[in-house]
């Protein structure tokens, strides 16, 4: 698991983890993992939860969480989904980094 950060020296590790879909953890409540299941739906609204359930059935391979809420995931077919729902400012900042998922190596 890569140790990452949303600022400073760990930012390079965060970008690497997101572009290569590698497990990572920050010192806070932001992490990603290779998985085919979901640990928690957190604060997802019904629309986002339904999308997540559909994608889990289709097959997922990587999920990014902020405060136990999935904020982005990558399906086995390579499709990246970033939730559209608004959250706190902190989770909003976390969501901002998920664009790197689409820059997969």
Residue ranges of predicted features:
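Terminal leader/tail segments of proteins
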Residues: 1-105
């Amino acid at each position: 698991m890569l140790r990452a950060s949303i600022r400073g020296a760990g930012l390079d590790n965060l970008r690497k983890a997101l572009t290569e879909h590698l497990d990572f953890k920050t010192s806070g409540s932001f992490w990603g993992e290779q998985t085919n299941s979901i640990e928690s739906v957190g604060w997802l609204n019904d629309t986002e939860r339904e999308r997540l359930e559909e994608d889990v059935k289709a097959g997922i391979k990587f999920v990014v969480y902020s405060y136990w809420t999935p904020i982005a995931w990558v399906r086995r077919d390579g499709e990246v989904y970033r939730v559209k729902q608004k959250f706190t400012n902190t989770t909003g900042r976390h969501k901002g980094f998920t664009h790197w998922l689409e820059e997969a190596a």
